[in-house]
């Protein structure tokens, strides 16, 4: 069987859909985006949506290893952006209620099905060391709990970056 390299453009709704389950391999660097990079991403997205431009917004490239027909995708490049977008979605969800909140949360976690005994699943799995933290605060939409944590008590720099970028996004949304 020959291996193929293919490229495709997807809208954000498809990127965070049941078509993909992203896994960050252990060999990838930890989450390292600074508040500056996060602020630029937020500003770019805000400006694009405020202009109501008919053109597509290029969010950047993501390189995956993924078999056709499979949800699981190993993230080779783009993990910083995917992680930051998930933090943004969680921050937005924390400010919403009802159906609006649910519509945002399904971009962070697949719904599952109690009748089929399928549990909800995160769409993004970080490196093992940071996944429990990310799952609890970001994928669990506990933004207030995350922001209340003492950064000196966190296990590593990746967790502090998650908190700081969440704070940056939270403040930016509140200012809008």
Task: Locate predicted features.
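Glycine- and hydrophobic-rich flexible loops that cap the catalytic core of alpha/beta enzyme folds
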Residues: 1-176
């Amino acid at each position: 069987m020959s291996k193929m390299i293919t490229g495709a453009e997807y809208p954000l709704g498809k990127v965070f859909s049941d078509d993909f389950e992203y896994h960050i391999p252990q060999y990838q660097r930890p989450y390292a985006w600074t508040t500056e990079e996060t602020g630029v991403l937020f500003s770019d997205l805000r400006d694009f949506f405020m202009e109501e431009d008919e053109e597509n917004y290029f969010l950047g490239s993501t390189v995956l290893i993924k078999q056709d027909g499979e949800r699981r995708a190993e993230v080779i490049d783009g993990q910083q952006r995917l992680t930051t977008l998930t933090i943004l979605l969680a921050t937005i969800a924390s400010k919403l209620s009802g159906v609006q909140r649910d519509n945002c949360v399904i971009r962070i976690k697949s719904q599952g099905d109690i009748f089929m005994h399928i549990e909800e699943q995160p769409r993004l799995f970080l490196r093992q060391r940071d996944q429990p933290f990310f799952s609890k605060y970001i994928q669990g939409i506990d933004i207030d709990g995350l922001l209340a944590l003492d950064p000196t008590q966190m296990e590593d720099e990746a967790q502090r970056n998650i908190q700081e970028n969440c704070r940056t996004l939270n403040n930016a949304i509140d200012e809008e």
